[in-house]
């Protein structure tokens, strides 16, 4: 896909999500920002629609059911603040959002020790992560950076991120090597 076409499609995501009732959380009033699929017990949307779920379809994502969160639903979950040094400017920033495991639990995700997740960003970047690592490293789904909501086109609107400065095996690495498992512009999580 050409970069310009991708960026145009990405900027239209909120409009597509708002137009597709299956893409919004049951109690949500805004567009879906995050879709959880796979081994989940709760659902509020049906299967992928190849015509309307263009980004997922082009990234070869397939599912029969899912659970979506809009901004309000994510904001309603208990949130924590972390303060990692970011690779982009070498400065400490405050990132706030719910723990990834709390987001998964809200969707009724399978939480056994053997479970794993794939975290996928809008550009197709995907990270496979054992659920135990997500718990141990206290991944959050950040919605705010330095007290402000994160925008699409920056690191947001959602970023699966850790406080790498406080994880011993990562804190010893150069800053630009600490966030390889932290996709920004997160929009899909598959649980298996």
Which stretches of residues belong to each language-model region?
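N-terminal intrinsically disordered, low-complexity segments enriched in P/E/S/T
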Residues: 21-192
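N-terminal export signals
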Residues: 5-23
């Amino acid at each position: 896909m050409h970069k310009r076409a991708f960026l145009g499609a990405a900027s239209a995501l909120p409009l597509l999500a708002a137009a597709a009732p299956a893409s919004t959380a049951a109690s949500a009033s805004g567009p879906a920002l995050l879709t959880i699929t796979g081994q989940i017990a709760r659902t509020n949307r049906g299967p992928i629609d190849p015509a309307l779920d263009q980004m997922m379809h082009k990234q070869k994502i397939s599912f029969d059911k899912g659970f979506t969160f809009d901004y309000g639903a994510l904001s309603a979950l208990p949130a924590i603040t972390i303060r990692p040094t970011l690779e982009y400017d070498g400065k400490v920033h405050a990132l706030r959002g719910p723990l990834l495991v709390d987001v998964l639990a809200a969707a009724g995700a399978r939480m056994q020790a053997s479970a794993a997740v794939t975290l996928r960003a809008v550009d197709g970047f995907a990270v496979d992560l054992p659920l135990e690592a997500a718990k141990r490293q206290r991944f959050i789904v950040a919605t705010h950076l330095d007290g402000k909501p994160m925008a699409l086109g920056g690191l947001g609107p959602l970023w699966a991120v850790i406080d790498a400065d406080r994880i011993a095996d990562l804190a010893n690495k150069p800053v630009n090597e600490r966030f390889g498992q932290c996709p920004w512009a997160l929009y899909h999580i598959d649980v298996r």
